[in-house]
């Protein structure tokens, strides 16, 4: 079909205001990841895709079979009224012509079937940003303007970014990515999503990198640590200090009012709610499916063979045979409790502590044997998180969102009320007569100690 025809179809009913944004925000969508190539033009030092290569690429015929399978399979259709297609690699923009064909094909197919996903479809790109500035990319965004979102991998300052996100010949990629970022920002006013990643070798750049990302215009910075076994004995202390220095900067500059970073999320490090203990953290296999270049089906992208040192992938079906529900069944029981040891199950700062069933499977040979490389780093994050919210209370005189969240997110989920008698110097009113000329006031130290007691009991 000609470009004019696809544009005409998309313009008839496909607009962002027709999509149930509330439903998307609550995570109510089927996430289908399509690995269009295992090739990448970068060699990032911390990348978990250890088996990238330049010969495994998806064909359009395979892509069409994947789309046909998703659209016609009852299991996929019943999972959600919303569909997210995530194009990934390698570097997906290396196969932009293929992605363009795939996007047109699924839109036309959904339209012809009057499918519920036609007005509830989003395309997502997980890209390193170096190949964005191209004619085909420009044409694609004009055509699929209303349902395509980009996530740029920008790690922070040029020094930090160029240390870890390098080209095949060892050069930094910061300048190329920033050029792409500014072009996208100039062309479109949409919010741009970013992701930054930190490992042992670059922790010392964390504070300056988060500030740099804020300066670029990212008000809510998404940043995380790698899950792999890379951490050294001194890293938790470095991480904690970097975050505390960042917290100090936020209050001294006033940016705590306008900007945020994931490390200071209000729930991070709270005791686990009872309902969290029996939930799957990521939804692999029942909220997400991933397809490799040959059309094999996996619970998520991290189960692909190229993501494992020993090529131990976990295939749960194919486009020819469909989903193997017996293979998926093993994932149904992967909850916090079932994959964790006694230490994790009794942890009092467990909320937001990352775990990955694919990593369990690849490193320990079982979905139910939790990898814990991140443990001490998470605890360091929690200490810094408490520091941030404590300073928030000192600066504002208000009860922090973290304290409120702890009550709401507690295991018992019931509100408790505590009264602080901060002074006995009450004025006379009605039938009450003032009994003291000089009042007794609760000291700040006593107030802080009492509040800590309440939080811990």
Give names to the regions the model predicted.
Residues 241-271, 302-354:
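C-terminal accessory region of radical SAM enzymes
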Residues 39-49, 299-302, 341-359, 377, ...:
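Local cysteine-cluster metal-coordination motifs and their immediate loop/turn environment
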Residues 282-286:
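Short, small/polar residue-rich loop motifs at catalytic or cofactor-binding pockets
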Residues 207-277:
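Long, K/E/R/D-enriched contiguous segments that form extended
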Residues 26-61, 410-447:
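Canonical Radical SAM [4Fe-4S] cluster-binding loop centered on the CxxxCxxC motif
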Residues 67, 71-88, 95-226, 444-457:
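Radical SAM/AdoMet-radical enzyme domain recognition
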Residues 69-88, 372-407, 453-457:
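Short Fe-S-cluster ligation motifs
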Residues 1-33, 76-78, 391-421, 438, ...:
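N-terminal [4Fe-4S]-dependent radical SAM core
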